[in-house]
A protein has these predicted regions:
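A structural micro-motif recognizing beta-strand termini
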Residues: 39-48, 57, 77-84
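Glycine-enriched, solvent-exposed interface loops adjoining structured elements
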Residues: 1-35, 46-72, 87-300
Length: 300
């Protein structure tokens, strides 16, 4: 199952045409690595060095100057570490250094999470909880992240191990917090054998991915097959801002680029990827609705 780090690599590879476009790369040669506050960095190669932004791991740094003979980068004091809102962090020796990254890792992660946040209600995560049925009790607490109840069943007594569906229930999204320690409860009106286990499947808003080793399906709650929906959504979001860096008045380099590519090339590519995203989103939505259809039930 893919994790956040693999999704980031997939988006990077797709946006760079697999191997067609390659960022300039060197490596961190400081013995023992660097701390979160070090401003001098030894590197393994002086090729293609330039003043500006570099990326180490998830952190962006602003390089104020460099020394080709001693193979060192000098980071600007104050704002140079954790540049553009990234988090300063220690980095190990031989860590990859990307010079002027086209698509910084933090921006890709944000685009992935923005896509995940936009999926609900077309796509939703699925979770479940269990509790013991009490004949004297009607309302049972549900987890705080519950959005809707999808299916309820209970385990019958005896060796059959059968789980019967429950058809008389009602969800309360404004339950008394003092009574249940949550605002989500389910009222069960079916006749269930006391002491038996009741299982509730419920929908949740997909969770964001935070750490590079976060498992996609395990953390978000989304189906494994929706992975490409998220990567396509991140790709069209990132591509939609490419043209802003090529506006004629921004730099001499932008003027030169405009002689080779039209100024709307990024927007055109973004629209194409967006169409693919919409198609896959619709396909996954139909699959999820087929797996968890709206079930007729009584509310009293």
């Amino acid at each position: 199952m893919p994790n956040l780090g693999q999704l980031v690599s997939e988006v990077q590879s797709n946006l760079q045409g697999y191997t067609l476009r390659q960022d300039r790369i060197t490596w961190l040669a400081t013995p023992g690595g660097i701390s979160a506050t070090d401003l001098t960095i030894q590197i393994g190669s002086a090729d293609n060095l330039a003043k500006g932004i570099v990326q180490i791991g998830n952190e962006l740094l602003w390089v104020n100057s460099f020394d080709r003979q001693n193979l060192t980068l000098n980071v600007a004091p104050g704002f140079g570490r954790g540049y553009m809102g990234t988090t300063p962090s220690p980095h190990a020796q031989n860590a990859q250094i990307i010079l002027t990254p086209t698509f910084p890792v933090t921006m890709i992660q944000q685009a992935l999470n923005d896509t995940i946040n936009s999926l609900y209600p077309k796509l939703f995560g699925v979770a479940n909880t269990t509790f013991q049925y009490n004949a004297a009790q009607i309302a049972y607490p549900l987890p705080d992240d519950t959005r809707d109840v999808l299916f309820i069943s209970w385990q019958t007594p005896g060796p059959s191990k059968e789980w019967l569906p429950t058809n008389r229930w009602r969800i309360d999204r404004m339950a008394n917090v003092a009574a249940f320690n949550t605002t989500k409860t389910v009222n069960i009106y079916d006749k269930i054998v006391p002491g038996r286990t009741v299982q509730v499947y419920y929908s949740i808003i997909p969770n964001n991915l935070t750490n590079l080793n976060d498992d996609f399906a395990g953390v978000t709650g989304l189906p494994e097959s929706s992975r490409d929906v998220v990567t396509l959504g991140a790709a069209y979001r990132l591509l939609s801002y490419i043209d802003t860096g090529r506006i004629n008045l921004s730099s001499a380099e932008a003027d030169l680029a405009d002689t080779k590519l039209p100024s709307t090339a990024g927007a055109s590519a973004s629209k194409y990827i967006f169409a693919l995203y919409q198609q896959r989103l619709q396909e996954e939505s139909v699959k999820l609705q087929d797996r968890f259809p709206i079930r007729v039930h009584y509310t009293k």
